[in-house]
Structure formats: structure tokens, C-alpha cells
Amino acid sequence: MSTYTRPVMLLLSGLLLLTLAIAVLNTLVPLWLAQEHMSTWQVGVVSSSYFTGNLVGTLLTGYVIKRIGFNRSYYLASFIFAAGCAGLGLMIGFWSWLAWRFVAGIGCAMIWVVVESALMCSGTSRNRGRLLAAYMMVYYVGTFLGQLLVSKVSTELMSVLPWVTGLTLAGILPLLFTRVLNQQTENHDSTSITSMLKLRQARLGVNGCIISGIVLGSLYGLMPLYLNHKGVSNASIGFWMAVLVSAGILGQWPIGRLADKFGRLLVLRVQVFVVILGSIAMLSQAAMAPALFILGAAGFTLYPVAMAWACEKVEHHQLVAMNQALLLSYTVGSLLGPSFTAMLMQNFSDNLLFIMIASVSFIYLLMLLRNAGHTPKPVAHV
């Protein structure tokens, strides 16, 4: 059976359009707020509202999928995000945008949970790594193209909102031509997110998603600041961030394939070790291009491999709940990691960015090494 079936390809095609819209808005909303002369704390609160919506959307989506299936859940998530986009143009103000970004955050998280869950339910333990790698490649390519669009088109609010909303609705079209089956049966009791977080045999996967959130959140949010403080120009900062993200894109497919072939545990150990090496290279002021490249290739691929690891440990009907738990773990890591790291950087040194990344990666490596010797046979999903 082919890994990339027709439903999978159409699902990823729709996701690409949605990711473009998400990337454009996430870049421009803080700039629009600044143009309206809102204070820094107001910009921060609006951003927090979006991420709070992410958490709420993550918690709700499992119930929605169980009630109406993958296709309708995907349509609903897209409509919610489109409403969050269009609503920004109805009234420009702090409280209004606070509410609409919360709505957009819910829709965005629902899209992620639906797509990730559909891919995991479509795959088996033999090809799930490649499916999630394809998902991450589409996500990063969409993010990259979104940034490119921002640099090429008008960024005025009322110029952007119509085509971004249209792009979001266009993301629904591919799914109209296929049906993604929800193979969870009603014979099983509903599985809670809490029970998935407590599942002992999946703990390395859950912890891996938290670590991935800390690493990626810190790199995305604080690397530009680190480079700026080193005297790097804005144009050069864009180049180095492109190197980082490009490495993540290029690393997805080969690492996903290696994880399917040689096992997730071995690949996770190597990835985390390489993240530590990349962090040390950045601290030692070595050649920045290779250091950033290996950091991006290893760091940006942690999430899908850790996710695939955790999903091997559960029954098929538990996959959606497990995916919610993993996305929730990643979100918590991506919120707490940059906040704590930024505080350390402000009070001590900018080098704490890479010391923090290396430290949490080393802790995770110790967890992975403790699992040496005997690894339970994964649950087979056919």
C-alpha cells in the first residue's frame, strides 16, 4: 500500500494553503498593532490570546472529530480560522482583536489536530515517520512561502485580509474531493488526554514534544534577537533564519525514513546529540552556517519523530487523544521555553539561548539512554 495515498496528498495540499494564511497573519498582526500605536504589553496580550486559543482548540478537537469525523472537523476548523481573519477588519481595537485572535487560535489548533490525527490514523508503524515528515515539510514550506508573500505584496490591513481569508477557504477545496476515514470505533470508551499524558510507555514521546517545543520556540522567537545583539543586520538575520528553516525542511524526509527503518529510539538519540553539538558549535563561535544547519536539521525534526514514537505505543482508537496530548505538550513547551530563556538572556548573557537548548536536550538524551536495552514492541496499526 502506498504511503502517500490520494486522501493524504489532498489533505497536505489543503494544509499548504492554510499554512500560507497562518504564516502571513502571524507575521503581520504584531506590525498592524504597532501601527495602531498600541503599547508593547497590549501586543503581547493579543499574542497570548492567540496561543490561549491554541490550547482551547487542542482540547476541543478530539470531541469534535469523534462527533463529526475528519472531513467536517477540517471544514469547521477552516471556517473558524477564516472568521478569525475576517473579524480583524470589522473593528480595529485592542479588545476586538483580542477576541478575534483567540478565535483564530482555536481554528489554527483544530486544523493541526485534525491533519496530524488523520495522517496518523492513515498510516502504520512502518510508514508513520514518513507521513509526519511530509506534514512537517508542507508546514515549513508554507511558512517560508508565507514570509516570501509578506515581502512581495502590500501589507496594508484591508489589502491583506480579503486574500488571506480567501486562501483559508480555498484550503477546504481539496478535501471536497476525498473522504478521510475515521477508523475509531464507537465500541471503545472515549480516551482522555490526561490518560495519554500519564501513559508510561509513551512518556518519551510526550517528553520529546515538550523538549521540541522548548527548542523550536526558543530558536524561532529568540534567534533573531541573539543575532541582532551580535550586530547582524536585519537582512542578514533573515538569511540566517532561512538557513535554519531550510535545514529543517531538508532534514524531514530522510530522518523520517531513517526512523521508519532503524527505529525511533536510535534516531531520537542521534538527533538530540546533534542538537547538543550544534548548540556547542554556536557557543564556540565556530562557522555559523554549518552550526545553524545541523541545529535546524536535528532540532526541527524532533517533533515528528517523538510524535511517531508515542503513537506506536497506543491502540488505533487512542490515536486522536494521543495526538491532542502531544500537541498540548509541544504548545506548553513552546510557551514556557522562550519566556524562561528570554529572562535568562536579559539578566545574564545572550549565550544562555544555546546553553538552555543544550541543557534541556542533554536531559532528554539521558531519558532516552535510560531506555537502552529493552524496548517494548510497538502496537501494530494496520
Curated annotation (Swiss-Prot):
CDD domains: MFS_YcaD_like. GO terms for cellular component: plasma membrane. It is found in: Cell inner membrane. Its main location: membrane. SUPFAM superfamilies: MFS general substrate transporter. PANTHER family: TRANSPORTER MFS SUPERFAMILY. This is Uncharacterized MFS-type transporter YcaD. It comes from Escherichia coli O6:K15:H31 (strain 536 / UPEC). The gene is ycaD.
